[in-house]
UniProtKB/Swiss-Prot annotation:
UniProt-annotated location(s): Mitochondrion
Keyword Lyase belongs to the record: no
Presence of keyword Coiled coil: yes
Expression triggers: Up-regulated during induction and maintenance of graft acceptance and down-regulated during graft rejection.
The gene coding this protein: TCAIM
Protein's organism: Mus musculus
InterPro entries found in the cross-reference section: DUF4460, DUF4461, TCAIM
Role according to the record: May regulate T-cell apoptosis.
Protein name: T-cell activation inhibitor, mitochondrial
GO cellular component labels: mitochondrion
Coiled coil (UniProt feature): 206-233
Keywords: Coiled coil, Mitochondrion
Highest rank taxon of the organism: Eukaryota
């Protein structure tokens, strides 16, 4: 049941994982962000203004961490490749270096390296905090089903944290971390104060990035026209300079070896971590791969197109067996799968239906207009609040049909609400963009339509002159990106932050 904790033992963390972890409910995304606040405070790029190299390392690592946490929260998530991260941690008092950590430098920070490999959100949060030698007591308070011994007994920690007298900080010249946390709680979690403190810096970064942004648009348009592409996208939050570099690389390949690239006509190209074709049929170009790998991919596209046709036929056969319901892949809610992986999942489910000899649905089109997604987990089928059915590939077909018939009307109602919510979201994005004269307003994939609607409604009640001409991203935390984009949490606070 708890096999996902085994990798932690190799790192000597078995003793420091709280005993109550084994009796806890799943941690929500919002609770995970809240639990990681001490970590975000220790690594936030804004505190590394005098150290551009360390700042960039933290910015890039935070992006990769955000992607990892987002994938952990997707329904049907099974596993991720181990992700190695490096962060520079702000230090105020001397500590002994431990495994995976470098000694503290004279500049007031130390480097910490760790590898994420857990498929559980709670154990991932605890692993991050422990790797950075940060407290974990507050995580226990987030869990409502704790029925075991207190944290101090499970971890062997002292009864209370060490609290130094003010004279210690006066004598040593170090800052009291409690005062820093209090200041950040008041300023960073208040939208107007945070914008006031960071607006000018963001404007400067945005202005500096404008030439590269124009170059990016030019390259994207030229390549789209040259290769007759449907679109060019990026799966990660790379900066403008990195995106330009990737497009230049593709442009050079198109000039040096144009033949294989004729196969990409009409496709969407996505720059990501690995090369191949996605479950949606997008051509994925791994940014760490060389031109030789890209060329082989372009040459093999005809075989991928054939697999796409077989996949569509398989989806149609499944639909016919299950009353006309549409089998879909929703990128925002499912783990990132290649076309091969998704076809294998469909094939497993189809064989499950055939082996059970389930008779055709008594009303062939009774579920027409409804949608279902397939997952690789072993949980029971469920109906998502957005209206689609989340179906494990190894579900019992007989009980599955009964479940779908019972929930069909509720699914249609959920889908109707989803469509109305999407329309409202688009209207509020347009209204907010116009009211604040934003150059761009967008959200991270992990932000739901409901969260975006709530955020925009509250924004429209504010007077925010700092946003004029800016790029605003609705996310889970505050940050100024390297090219000047402002990230704010969807549930931002106004006035005094809640303690």
């Amino acid at each position: 049941m708890f096999c996902h904790l085994r990798p932690l033992r190799r790192f000597g963390l078995r003793k420091v994982l709280p005993h109550w972890l084994h009796y806890s409910r799943a941690l929500s995304g919002a609770e995970a962000i809240n639990a990681l606040r001490p970590f975000y405070f220790a690594v936030h790029p804004d505190f590394f203004g005098q150290h551009p190299r360390e700042r960039e390392v933290n910015e890039n690592s935070l992006k990769r961490l955000s992607v990892y946490l987002e994938n952990l929260q997707k329904p049907g998530f099974k596993s991720l490749k181990p992700t190695q991260l490096t962060f520079y941690i702000r230090e105020k008092t001397a500590q002994n270096s431990s495994e995976g950590q470098e000694p503290i430098s004279t500049t007031g920070f130390r480097a910490v390296r760790f590898t994420l490999h857990s498929s559980d959100l709670l154990s991932t949060v605890l692993y991050i905090l422990n790797s950075c030698s940060l407290p974990v007591e507050h995580v226990q308070s987030l869990n409502t089903n704790v029925h075991s011994q207190p944290l101090k007994e499970a971890t062997g920690m002292p009864d209370r944290p060490i609290k130094w007298h003010r004279s210690y900080y006066s004598f040593t010249g170090f800052k009291d971390p409690d005062e820093d946390l209090t200041h950040v709680s008041r300023v960073e979690t208040t939208l107007t104060s945070w914008l006031g403190s960071n607006g000018k810096g963001a404007v400067k970064k945005l202005r500096n990035s404008l030439p590269l942004r124009k170059e990016l648009d030019r390259l994207k348009n030229e390549l789209s026209e040259l290769l007759q592409l449907s679109d060019i996208r990026w799966q990660r939050g790379w900066g403008v300079a990195h995106r330009c570099s990737q497009l230049h690389s593709l442009s050079r390949l198109a000039q040096q070896n144009p033949g294989p690239l004729q196969n990409v006509k009409g496709c969407t190209v996505v720059f990501t971590d690995r090369s191949g074709m996605s479950a949606l049929g997008h051509v994925m170009l791994g940014t760490m791969d060389v031109h030789h790998h890209w060329t082989r991919l372009f040459e093999s596209l005809p075989s991928y197109f054939d697999l796409q046709r077989r996949m569509s036929a398989l989806e149609a056969q499944i639909s016919n067996l299950l009353g006309g319901i549409q089998v879909v892949y929703i990128e925002e809610l499912q783990p990132a799968l290649t076309l091969d992986q998704y076809y294998s999942l469909l094939h497993t489910f189809y064989n499950q239906l055939l082996r059970s000899r389930v008779p055709p649905h008594p009303h062939p089109q009774s579920l027409s207009g409804l949608q279902m997604i397939l997952s690789s987990d072993r949980y029971a089928p469920s109906l998502h609040e957005l209206g689609h059915f989340d179906i494990p590939a190894l579900s019992d077909p007989a009980s599955l049909q009964s479940f779908m018939r019972t929930k069909a009307q509720q699914a249609r109602e959920n889908m109707t609400r989803r469509e109305k919510l999407k329309v409202m979201e688009n209207e509020l994005i347009q209204a907010s963009t116009k009211q604040f004269s934003l150059e761009k307003l967008y959200k991270e994939p992990s932000i739901s339509s409901r969260q975006m609607v709530d955020c925009c409604k509250r924004l429209l009640e504010q007077s925010l002159p700092y946003l004029h001409g800016m790029h605003l991203c609705v996310s889970h935390f505050y940050s100024v990106m390297q090219d000047g984009d402002l990230c704010i949490p969807w549930n931002w606070k106004k006035g005094e932050a809640m303690k």
